[in-house]
C-alpha cells in the first residue's frame, strides 16, 4: 500500500450521517445527493458508503477556478 494513502477503513464513510458531516450538508440533502448520484457514493448492502478521497476530489473539481 502507498504510504501516502490512508487505509481503506480510514477513507470510507459509512452511512448518510457520516457522509453528511464530512461534506457539511444536512441528512436529507445528502441522501438526495447520493440517490441522484450527484456525489460519488454507492449503496452496499442497503447502506450508503463514500470515499473521503473521492468526495474531496469531486468538490475540488467543482470549485476549480472559482474565486470568492
List each model region and its residues.
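Short intrinsically disordered terminal tails
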Residues: 1-3, 64-68
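Short helix-start
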Residues: 15-17, 40-64
